[in-house]
From Swiss-Prot:
Gene3D superfamilies: PDCD5-like
GO CC annotation, single: cytosol
One Pfam family in the UniProt entry: dsDNA_bind
Lineage top rank: taxon: Archaea
NCBIfam families: PRK04239.1
Family: Belongs to the PDCD5 family.
Keywords: DNA-binding
Protein name as catalogued: DNA-binding protein LS215_1892
Keyword DNA-binding in record: yes
GO molecular function annotations of the record: DNA binding
KW DNA-binding (keyword) present: yes
Record SUPFAM superfamilies: Double-stranded DNA-binding domain
């Protein structure tokens, strides 16, 4: 036995359809915005990195995507502020990576506390 659909149910269904359509549109706009920003970033990186340095960054991105994203943003900021010579060569990128690695090693401290047996 099926219950008759009331006007309120139809109204609710329409409201849910509209909400779903709005959410889908918002997600699509966000996806387009992210794609556009990524395209702009790639364009900037093509200018500030030599092909070899770009390849190294691509390799890093495959292994550590979050680190690569952070590194890309830092490189772009350094280049735009004029604090680094452009284009960045592979050797210069290696030096930057070594500096970051040293800094991370200094930040990483292991504390060992001895506890007595009781």
């Amino acid at each position: 036995m099926s219950a008759p659909t009331s006007y309120d149910d139809e109204e609710l269904e329409e409201l849910l359809r509209r909400k779903a359509a709005q959410e889908q549109k918002r997600l699509e706009e966000e996806r387009k915005r992210k794609a556009e920003l990524e395209s702009q970033k790639e364009s900037i990186l093509r200018v500030i990195l030599t092909p070899e340095a770009r390849q190294r960054l691509t390799n890093i991105k495959l292994v550590k995507p979050e680190f690569a994203e952070s590194l890309e943003n830092q490189l772009i900021a350094l280049a735009q502020s004029g604090r680094i010579k452009v284009p960045i060569t592979d050797e210069e990128l290696k030096q930057i990576l070594e500096q970051i690695s040293e800094q991370n090693r200094r930040d990483f401290k292991i504390q060992i506390r001895e506890r007595g047996w009781k």
